[in-house]
Amino acid sequence: MNSKTLLRSFTFSLTAACLLTACQKNFLDLKPQSQPNADNFYRTANDFGNAVNGAYDNLQSTNQYGGDFNTLVEARSDNVIDIDPSSNAGLRYNIDRFIEPTTNSVLRDTWGSLYAGVNRTNLILDKIDAVEFDATLKARYKGEAQFIRGLLYFNLVRLWGNVPLVLTGGTTTDARTYKRNEVSEVYAAIEKDLTAATTNLPATYTGANVGRATSGAARALLAKVLITEKKFAEAIPFLRDVVSSGTYRLLANPGDPFLVTNKNNAEILFAVKYRKGGLEGHGLWYGTNIGNNIEPMLRAAYSPEDKRLPLVAQVPVPNNVNVVPRKFYDEFSSANDVGNDFPVLRYADVLLLYAEALNEVGYAATGDAFTSLNAVRTRAGVAAYTATQVATKEAFRTAVINERRLELALENDRWFDLVRTGTAIDALKKTGVTVPANRLIYPIPQSEIDVYNNPTNFPQNPGY
């Protein structure tokens, strides 16, 4: 994107990219069909269905779950190391080593992609109430847009801190007035969106709609947001609802949820959908050296009997010079055309969040916190914790965060977990990397700073 990234995101996202699903019945059929004018588009239920599909499509972007989040969240953490200063012109290496300049194009393009997605959802929510169609379907479309917008802003605020909070479709003139809102304002908007989504979304889908956001996914994401804000008591009811619903469960083996032949399984609450062939695959671990460079300390953190250890081992790719982590291995893939879905919310994540929240509200030597934590451990073939081993709130907190690292490795959680628990600087120090305190959030892309040219309302993050 050029220097008008955010401005362009709010004026061209619908006509240039949003309607990638026109005339398609299956929301995974993401081939472009038409690019109608936005002013004339939102007239029927089918129009809104296509627009919602376009919002899902945005998440697939190479600048989000299709690639760059891997750099921004995993390579930034103590899970993955980029050892090649020349990798992608140094873009990933600089992020891995906390020396990225404000002109880093990974940051610029991810920012632009996230705000393009925000505008897609804004346009849906702006226009949907003015069109008459089935109330249940309308509520679902609103819920899907609210869920996706909440997820987009959750990623924005965790990556950059204060960000522009834009909740309506805008013009270039409007965009020039945007300011960077406080983190608390952004989180309040996320909570509002996800709370509404818990009501508007159905619990399950059938047929071609399986894989869309559900009320359970909205509850889990809302709980994750609340825990990030340290609102542990508020998160517990949402997590308890998911656990008690009976809709989700741990699969028998830790690797089962990731199999390309096992999509939409009972452990997945929400995943970004990919499908090998044409425009619908991804190249997450291909064409990079990151797949080759799992941090040795991550592998060392697993006990030998842990069934999750092989998932972070590198696997040679047929007919390709690269290797990929087994967790995301697709034996039928080719470079940049991988069919694995990318998990955003898994039931194992829910159980660990539930254990964490319960412990933060009050440590107990028995009960649901230990039960939830140990369910994840025993599925992995490692011994359950006892109250003798984990005897205090502090010890339990450490145990949960360590378990999250082992269970959710390479799933775009580790850096966020380190930052929210205040342990990022110490964790990276163990890998030989010194993290300046200001680099717990990324610099605002320089292109945004330049185009706004307003140090009062649109300042750079401190220290950059």
How would you describe each model-predicted region?
Residues 37, 49-53, 57-63, 85-160, ...:
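Conserved, well-structured interaction surfaces
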Residues 2, 23-74, 123, 184, ...:
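Acidic, glycine-rich segments characteristic of secretory precursors and extracytoplasmic regions
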Residues 232, 364-366:
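TPR-repeat structural position
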Residues 1-21:
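Sec-dependent bacterial lipoprotein signal peptides
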Residues 39, 66-88, 166-168, 201-284, ...:
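Short, surface-exposed recognition loops and adjoining beta-strand edges that mediate ligand/DNA contacts
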Residues 22-23, 56, 64, 77-88, ...:
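Long, intrinsically disordered, low-complexity segments
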